[in-house]
Amino acid sequence: MTHLFYLILSQLSTGAFLRIVTPTGIFFHYLVLFHVTSGFLFLGFGSFHLFRKYKSGEGLISSVQDSLISLTVLFGVFTFLTGRIGNLGEILVTLHLVSAIGFILATLVQYQTRNKKLIRHGIGLILAVGVLLGVNKIYNSKSITIENDKTDFFPSPVKTETGHYINASAIDRSQRCGTSGCHPDIYAQWQQSVHRLSSFNNPFYKSSVDYLMSTADSTTVRWCAGCHDPVMLLSGMMEGKIDFNSHEAQSGITCETCHGITSIQDITGNGNYVLDHPVEYPFSHSSGILQKINQMLIKVEPRAHRQKMLLPVHSEGEFCMTCHKVSLDKPQNNYRWLRGQNEYDAWHHSGVSGNAVASFYAPTSPLKCQNCHMGLEVSNDKGNDAGKVRGHFFNAVNTALPSLKDHLNPEWIKRSTDFMQDEKIAVDFYGVEIDGNYTSPLQDKITLQPSTKVRIDVVVRTKGIGHKFPGGTIDSNEPWLQVFVQNENGETIYGSGLLDGKKFVDQSAHFFRGILLDKHGEFILKRNPHEWVTTLYNNSIPPGSAEVIHYEWDIPDGVNGGFKIIANLNYRKFNRSITETFLDEPIYLPIVTMASDTVTIVVHSQNSNLKVEDAIRINDYGIGMLRQNNLEAARTAFTRVTELNPKYADGYINLARVHIKEGKFDLASQALLFAEFIKPKFPKVAFFRGLIAKKLGNYPKAIQLFEQVRKTHPEDRININELGQ
């Protein structure tokens, strides 16, 4: 028992140290290995001791010490088998330590009068914890990483913590995360994501880079690489000639390059992040039995891994912003600063983020990027929370990549399609004008006569989208509104936005996109933003907003019978020109109908009995008209909203918006009074009253009101700007 006492006291010393010390430095991890190894030695020695007791007739468990030492071993073995994962892991480690302490105390009580030397030795061994703390302090800064050359990432703003390159082998180990038994589900999800195919394994991106390098300074590609090719950039593989066929060129955005980000330098985007070398356990780059030992060490003591790989910044919108907010400047375009795609600011200044007081619509609680694009998935992966993990499919709208021969994945296509069709956007046949008479909102059936010119209004509203629609590269993405009329035989007799024989969209269609021009006035059609100098138009829709599209149709003579008017909001990831330019063997990319509406044309009068629910349709139309500065139509619409649903405070708020634009401040104030009566302490009321006070020159009152809004919406940029002015 004395020998067992010394051995378990030794284990207790290292165990206590491992329990109370923050897991940093290589010494700590080697001590874990020592603790586990000596634990198995103790298991063998203890088993032999119990066997001897059993043979002598004493029984296996004959004392308190035997019970406690058995529990110590049992909890230790369970911890080794299951890992220190989650609440169960922490409970096992705690019980393992408590039972060991109990054994020591019970033994000291038993031997205190008979063996003073034992106590002195015990105290000495406990003091060993202090020595271990000192050694850990000395070696805390020691690392098993290799110091590389200083970085040159320009024009990318990426930085590393050390200012040196990082070995590619340290940040290109996604497969290890998935095959070590820790994160197989997350790894499988990542394999079916655009992050996996962000680099030169993406033919659309590779073709874009090929064109860039043939028409601009070759170092410009580093500006792209901070987000598309982090392994190559961070390891210095973009110095000199780039090997597009290397393993690293096919790596995409790996686990380590995303989770290795320690901070976001500011909110300018373009990959303006700081990345650190991942924490290294012993034998991180080994194979065979040493690799198994490495995996065991991470499982038994994952705190260092967890603390380094999951930081608070990783759950913030700013984390996604760093690569989903883009600008170009002279180093990229030899021209001037231009704003590229920008999902972050659109989200930040919207009701979705909870920041914008004046938003038309907002969810019941604020949402971040991760809520929509990293929804919870059922998983038993290590580190799961109640059986769920954040999804690493990064659900979005890219159905092009999983349609390619080398990456064909019907499951991915279906998942993206389901995501796009999940209440992201709405299409509504709102109204029709016949011979100067306007009828709205339309019900399921309308009356039209031959030889009549009609104007049909279609409202498109963003609903479940936290940024502008479309997001991403608006020059190559292809969402459009397809409107067509079918007769009783299903034949199309009128159409806008239909496809021709080569799958090009009718160019008279209404597209939700941006048309970018180069210095010659030519369209940017090769994903060549470095040649972009100006934007012809941008038809994107802000989050929680709406657009109205007008169609005219001359109904010919002799047309009678029943018809259907159908409107589809279609989305194709890349327009046909991009597909034909970039793919050696062009394919037909999927076209997803995100939303649709249908109205039947019959020969009896429309039912004009409106329901309260129709108020939202009218409101959406008013929003679209207000965005087009058609104030008369907007005012009429919002007035109807207040008449149809007088309890809807936003109806009066929106009416006040129109009156303020018209300079009718008395009417606006009156509308705000109604809104305040319906919804007391409504921040929108204070904001628009502040606008009125400012326009009337009552600056003290305006300041008071804008400050009032700041208390509930401190991040609202528009309110802050109004206050500053």
PLM feature spans:
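Primarily the internal scaffold of c-type cytochrome electron-transfer domains
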Residues: 121-125, 138-168, 186-220, 237-543, ...
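Amphipathic alpha-helical repeat scaffolds of TPR domains
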Residues: 611-624, 650
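Structural signature of tandem alpha-helical TPR/SEL1-like repeats
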Residues: 628-640, 661-674, 681-686, 693-708, ...
